[in-house]
Amino acid sequence: PGMTVGMSGFTGSGYPKEVPLALAEQIEEAHAKGEDFRVRVWTGASTGPELDAALAKVDGIEFRLPYNSDPIAREKINSGKMDYFDMHLSQVAPMAWQGFLGKLDVALVEVTGITPDGLLIPSSSVGNNKTWLARADKIILEVNSWQSPALEGIHDIYYGTQLPPLRVPIPLVRADDRIGSKYLQVDPAKVVAVVETDKPDRN
């Protein structure tokens, strides 16, 4: 209860699908006993019904950013039952790194797979996953076998960004330039669970 969870997901793709449903069940059971149980949710953008709808339906989200398209969550926001920060998507990661948004307790990130040397094969979206994995105290990974193995190699994860005043231009000058890694990095000491799923994306 009260934790801030950074979840993967961007335009209905690559969001976690198992853990949010299980969390919603726990929250509903706690509320039935009269216990207060809500979480703060950060994402890359919109997600899917297994995340926003499931948690909003049981009044499980205390605070949400930066974007929402779920009708159940929208009703909670507009009625004042859920706090919401409608911010530009590009501002989320820098503000998280600068500490403006507070502590990130848990990262819950869907991946396509994990390499033998511990690198993460990104799923069908990346969003703020790099930031969540770096900033969170604990990490839960959802490995989704529904996602195509062909996703390995199409991403370009850039690890050269810095905060002002040390920030420099991203060295991307041509449409076919690659400046980063095919994989997301993770500290294995922070990984507390790996959950398997085969559920499809909303989009």
Regions found by a protein language model. Name each.
Residues 1-203:
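Conserved alpha/beta enzyme-core scaffold
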